[in-house]
Amino acid sequence: MAKYFTKRVLELIPKILVITVIVFAVLQMLPGDALSRTIPPIQYNQMSEVQKEAMRESMGLNDPYYIQFVRWFGNLLKGDFGYSQSTGSNIFEMLKNRLPATIELTLLALIIAGVFGIFFGFIASLKQNSPLDYINTTASIVGISIPEFFFGILFILIFSVYLKWLPSGGRMTVGIDSFFDRLKYMIMPATCLGISLTATLSRYTRSTMLDVMGKDYVKTARAKGLSEKDVILKHVFRNALSPIMVILVMRLPMLVSGTVVIEAVFNYPGMGSMILDAISAGDMPVVMITTMVVAIVTLFASLLVDIFTALLDPRVRFE
């Protein structure tokens, strides 16, 4: 397992380098002065042309691109991501505040999808071709077909505007910093984010359970006189759970990408809304850096998928 883990980690290195090279190249092609993306805008606007040129020389902005890339990559490793052109804020500080919010939202969506998707699929498999099974199948198709932002608007209208049970946006109440307060703000966006995955898991759980029910070892267990409860839980569900969990974890990178739209709908202060705000303001340094961070987070999520898959299915390690 250690050898497999090391191999997967080493495979990340060239991928991360490619991402950083692309981001650096795009930043270099942006119109305007590269110095304005390196220092705070207020400081840049107060400098004369002579001072700007002297600073460009001292910071190596006139050096060949490959030297600039090495220096820029080294600054990234130290947490120096530059400054926003629209707000003048340090991009690293912006990320430090936004990234944890997106991670919290994604993990909650994953938990919601895992619990409800597997539960609904489990029940549907036991009630095959019953009205409950047809309702579950129809709901799954609806959950997969309708975009997440529609559910977001619908949830806001029902639970915030009409019922007034939950806040329509934000991350926490001013002056209150507790887990349950943040949970109150996260429950709607996380549920909307996880609806598609819940529907997918429900259908996959049902089909996997039905497939396992037809296996010879399940028939043998019934022939031995085991109770239906023991057959389902110990022989059917246990053997069906491994591929189901693989599907659940494999969708983690897609959840990270889906936060962009959901955070905008609920005005949730995470990475997704940060990217959209930067695009609206034409703040390309922030757009490129946040895109790079999301891509790297997605790569690490994919690494977790590979490791989790290998833990559940040892055959993967030897492929």
Question: Can you describe what each PLM-predicted range is?
Answer:
Residues 2-24:
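Hydrophobic secretory-pathway targeting helix
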Residues 2-3, 99-132, 176-319:
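Alpha-helical transmembrane segments of integral membrane proteins
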Residues 10-14, 18, 65, 107, ...:
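Membrane-interface helix starts
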Residues 18, 22, 26, 116, ...:
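Alpha-helical membrane-inserting segments
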Residues 23-27, 32, 152, 156-160, ...:
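Juxtamembrane/transmembrane-helix interface segments of polytopic membrane transporters
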Residues 137-200:
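Membrane-water interface segments at transmembrane-helix boundaries in multipass membrane proteins
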